[in-house]
Amino acid sequence: MIEAGELGDIRVVHAAYVQDWLTLPIDADGHKQAEWRTDPDRAGASACLADIGVHAHSLALFVTGLELDAVSADLATFVPGRRLDDNAHVLMRFQGGARGVLAASQVAVGNLNNLSLKVYGARGGLEWAGEEPETLRFTPYGEPSRILRRGGPGNTPLAIEGSRMPGGHPEGYVEGFANLYRGAAELISARRAGRPPERTAKLTPNVLDGARGVAFIEAAVKSSQKDGAWTSARFD
């Protein structure tokens, strides 16, 4: 829909990924999953932002097609004794002029695994939440909001190709991984056969997408260390 211009030029992007599983100091109590994620020797320079915030970043770039220009970040650690961040707020400037904000937290009580994205353009807006993945809220400017359901009227051809179950039959997380594996296999098969890959396979993340995520994390960490100073996040 964005690629087709239904939102017009993108102006504002809100991305968030919030959880509450690190609200208590379980990393200091032998919880293996929490322990390594908050250990700078094993996890690197960031915990929360590198663990889940980067997924919100990747989602925002994938959906909008935008590229980052610079970030202003505030990484915080709320649980005493924890060595890496458990909360992150990042202001984003995109190449082309759009603005964005990304929030990531693992101490947001009441949130199990809440990934969400809101995109607003000159002609309309889109809103999606990972805990309700079957629906997409689309609002053309000056018109009533429309709730689009996976497998229902209004789905784009690519969305239909990415679905496996009929509309109304819950689908999502596991099937998303299956689509990634299928896309990767198709890219390999097409390369070996010397033919163009299927169009859905072209959406499969590659090493450059991973490198973009690393560049984003590094820029945000540097910005936070400089009290939120605007820091280049360009991936050239």
Located regions from the model:
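Hydrophobic side-chain positions on well-ordered alpha-helices
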Residues: M1-A4, L187-R191, G210, S223-S224
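Predominantly a Rossmann-like dinucleotide-binding segment in NAD(P)-dependent oxidoreductases
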Residues: M1-R82, L136, D227
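C-terminal glycine/acidic-rich active-site capping loop/insertion
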Residues: Q33, R37, F62, A70, ...
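Conserved loop-to-helix N-cap of the C-terminal "lid" that shapes the substrate pocket in Rossmann-like
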Residues: A50-G53, V174, T204-A211
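Glycine-rich, aromatic-lined ligand/substrate-binding cores of catalytic
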Residues: I52-V71, A76-G125, G130-E134
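A general structural signal for well-ordered alpha-helical segments in protein cores
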Residues: A56-H57, L180-A185, I217
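NAD(P)-dependent dehydrogenase/reductase Rossmann-like domain
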Residues: E127, R195-R199, P205-L208, R212-G213, ...
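Alpha-helical scaffold segments in carbohydrate-active enzymes
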Residues: G213-A220
